[in-house]
Regions:
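Conserved phosphate-binding catalytic cores of ATP/NTP-utilizing and phosphoryl-transfer enzymes
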Residues: 54-76, 178-199
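Short beta-strand(s) of the beta-wing in winged-helix/HTH DNA-binding folds
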Residues: 24, 53-54, 59, 143
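Gly/Thr-rich phosphate-binding beta-strand-loop-beta motif of the actin/hexokinase/Hsp70
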Residues: 63-100, 200-209
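Short glycine/proline-centered loop/turn elements that form peptide/ligand docking sites
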Residues: 3-7, 21-23, 38-41, 45, ...
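Glycine-rich phosphate-binding loop and adjoining helix at the ATP-binding site
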Residues: 99, 103-122, 129-198
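Basic amphipathic alpha-helical segments that dock to polyanions
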Residues: 17, 28, 39-52
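Extreme N-terminal segment that seeds HTH/winged-HTH DNA-binding domains in transcriptional regulators
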Residues: 1-25, 29-30
Length: 209
C-alpha cells in the first residue's frame, strides 16, 4: 500500500508528464521540486505498474544520455461529461488526456437528463473495457464534499447523488465538480495557467456564475 506522501509525489510526477508529454528524470526534478532520489523511486514504481513507458533517449551532446519517460496512453481511458440544459456533451480520453472520441446526447422531447447520462455511459463503457474514471461537470449548486447536486433548476434536480448513482451502476471512480471549477483546474494543471500560483479563469458559457 502506498503511503500518502508517495501518492502525492506520484501525482506531481504524473501531472508533470501529462503537461510536458515526455521528460527525463532531471526535467521532472526541475518541474516538481522533488529530490532526485524521490523521482527515481517513483518513476521506477510507475514503470513496474506500467503507468509509464520509456520514450527513447535524449540528445545529450556529451556524457551519459538520459532516458525519456512518458505516460502510457494505452493503460486505460477516462470519460468526461459536461451537463448542459441543451444536452450532454462529453469526451473519451486516453491517459495522456488526448481526446479519443467526442460524445453527445441532446436533451429535449421529454428526455430525462439522468437517462441521457446513463445511455452515454452504457455505450462508452461497453466499448471501452478499461475505463479508469469518470468526471462530471455540472451547473447549479453543488455539495463538493458529499458529491451531491443540491440544486440544478434546468434539470429539475434537487439533492441528486449523481456520483453514487454512477459508481453503483458501473463500479468506476467518479468525480463531480462545477463546470467552471473543472475548466479552471484544467488550465492550472495542464493549460495556459500551469505553474502559476494565482490566476483568474473567466467563462462566458451559459450557467457560468
Amino acid at each position: 500500500m502506498l503511503d500518502q506522501i508517495k501518492i502525492h509525489n506520484i501525482k506531481q510526477i504524473m501531472l508533470c508528464l501529462m503537461a510536458r508529454r515526455c521528460a527525463t528524470k532531471a526535467e521532472i526534478v526541475e518541474d516538481t521540486g522533488l529530490s532526485t532520489s524521490t523521482v527515481s523511486s517513483c518513476v521506477n514504481s510507475l514503470l513496474k505498474l506500467k503507468l509509464l513507458v520509456v520514450n527513447g533517449m535524449d540528445d545529450s551532446s556529451g556524457g551519459r544520455r538520459s532516458t525519456i519517460y512518458r505516460v502510457n496512453s494505452a493503460y486505460g481511458c477516462f470519460i468526461g461529461l459536461d451537463l448542459r440544459p441543451e444536452g450532454i456533451q462529453g469526451v473519451v480520453t486516453d491517459c495522456e488526456a488526448q481526446i479519443l472520441k467526442r460524445i453527445s446526447f441532446p436533451l429535449g422531447g421529454g428526455t430525462a437528463p439522468l437517462h441521457a447520462i446513463m445511455e452515454l455511459l452504457n455505450a462508452e463503457i461497453a466499448h471501452n473495457k478499461n475505463v479508469l474514471g469518470i468526471g462530471v461537470g455540472a451547473a447549479g449548486k453543488l455539495d463538493y464534499e458529499e458529491q451531491i447536486i443540491v440544486s440544478a433548476p434546468e434539470f429539475g434536480w434537487q439533492f441528486v447523488h449523481l456520483k453514487e448513482i454512477i459508481e453503483r451502476q458501473y463500479m468506476v471512480f467518479t468525480h463531480l465538480d462545477h463546470q467552471i471549477n473543472a475548466g479552471a483546474i484544467y488550465e492550472g494543471m495542464m493549460g495556459c495557467a500551469r505553474g502559476e500560483k494565482h490566476y483568474l479563469y473567466i467563462s462566458e458559457a451559459p450557467g457560468g456564475k
